[in-house]
């Protein structure tokens, strides 16, 4: 089987690359080998949702009046995102006559893999794991790590519901704690002059301001906003996982992309809608191939708060080996 004939994670891509349908498990499988190689294993996944989820709505008065707590700017941003994803779905249906598929077949196990493994983890080629907390490994990272073309972060944002789940990346209590945690990362010293920083955020409005305000985190790192990518979560039917107009739950997550202040923006870096059926909790699509289209195939990446390794990249966090245990994989025959 040649590289071109293997099952690609890309199910559809518009000519201008502003709209793409990805299969999340396949992005993980592709990330386990270098770009010129063919994946050798399949990852254990969750059953894909066949239909949208019911969306609990808040009360319309008192403490449940969500609109009273949202600034006009945040409301406008939500409306713009809703319009963007609605337009993307309309383009898929009308402009491109695309009706599926929205995912590939998945390797499902009736019983989830055990939380702890007695077998050594599977390590991709040229992957550099830093398994430990930001606080514990900061000095080691600072003294040994190179400069990166891309840094991807998926921080444990404050979230009450997530705190009830078993997750080594315990969510912080508030944004002040998050600022203290993230500012311990010597990111500016390890970003190339034209490097990019891409950060996953939740839909809590204060987080966007926390990053991009004049006194926000990006400014502290000497960065400025370039663009945003939106992951639109859909069921296998292609319908958004939650009602786009829902007040309380949104069917998307944002990836905020920044560069050094004053540096040149890559010509290929533009807004993007990524349509993908979600997998197990906390699993994001691997972004290596998408950013290679922007930065070139030789770009060196670092993923912070990683839950798996990527061939050719560095990964740092308490759970870098979480999905590298053999129980999560099956060899391709």
Name what the model sees in each region.
Residues 193-202:
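Conserved beta-strand signature within the Rossmann-like core of class I S-adenosyl-L-methionine
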Residues 180-191:
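Short, basic/hydrophobic alpha-helical segments
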Residues 1-153, 158-182, 204-333:
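Class I S-adenosyl-L-methionine
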